[in-house]
């Protein structure tokens, strides 16, 4: 019973705190630009509004258009549950869980790109092609980072890998993971998720035809992914040890 409660608590932490990080980022960006900016809790308001709205479907859309965001959200949530939360450890930990984490992130990306192509829109197909092109580089970088941590710690378990020091290569590891964080979360300089400029859109263009709950799943999944990479970056560079239980 305690394990179930612990799992539910960790799940609630990830799901409830994830939309807060994009709000903080947008607030800081607005402050730097000299603007007031949206409220920190704006994404919570948007998600609540989208869950109450209906879904507008293209006549060319298949069931994969609806299933894609749902499967991607489940995959990202599962990946988050594998990620240790500081010294408290992770909800699901086993030997080789880091490999499952990489596969779940790839599955989420595949489902998002698949759903984009199911609309029959050349515009979203272009975005899916751009996403896959960047994924080739990002996945190679994250695999290299995982391999370096595995060699350094002698383990392929996330809890062990992130509870020990990264050694002399911590700076290079941090630079690599930070680059992956930017590429995976619409934060590269020419991919602004707040704009709709055709020449620069990568991630945002894939979800232009989504609405209602599927769009809410996409936005919430993106916030979970951003928080996951932020936690991974911090713990890879600043290991916090491990406690037996919460």
PLM regions and their residue ranges:
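Alpha-helical transmembrane segments of multi-pass membrane proteins predominantly involved
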Residues: 1-246
């Amino acid at each position: 019973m305690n394990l179930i409660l612990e799992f539910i608590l960790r799940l609630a932490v990830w799901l409830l705190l994830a939309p807060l990080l994009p709000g903080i980022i947008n607030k800081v960006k607005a402050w730097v630009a000299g603007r007031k900016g949206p409220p920190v809790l704006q994404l919570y308001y948007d998600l609540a509004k989208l869950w109450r709205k209906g879904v507008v479907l293209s006549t060319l859309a298949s069931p994969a258009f609806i299933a894609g965001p749902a499967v991607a959200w489940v995959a990202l949530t599962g990946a988050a549950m594998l990620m240790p939360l500081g010294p408290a450890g992770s909800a699901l930990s086993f030997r080789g869980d880091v490999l499952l984490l990489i596969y779940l992130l790839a599955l989420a990306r595949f489902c998002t790109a698949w759903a984009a192509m199911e609309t029959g829109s050349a515009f979203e197909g272009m975005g899916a092609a751009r996403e896959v092109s960047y994924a080739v580089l990002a996945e190679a970088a994250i695999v290299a980072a995982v391999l370096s941590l595995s060699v350094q710690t002698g383990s392929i378990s996330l809890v062990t890998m992130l509870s020990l020091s990264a050694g002399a290569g911590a700076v290079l590891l941090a630079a690599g993971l930070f680059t992956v964080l930017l590429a995976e979360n619409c934060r590269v300089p020419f991919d602004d998720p707040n704009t709709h400029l055709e020449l620069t859109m990568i991630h945002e263009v894939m979800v232009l035809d989504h609405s209602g709950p599927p769009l809410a799943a996409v936005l919430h999944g993106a916030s979970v992914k951003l928080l996951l990479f932020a936690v991974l970056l911090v713990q890879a560079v600043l290991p916090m040890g491990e406690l037996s239980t919460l």
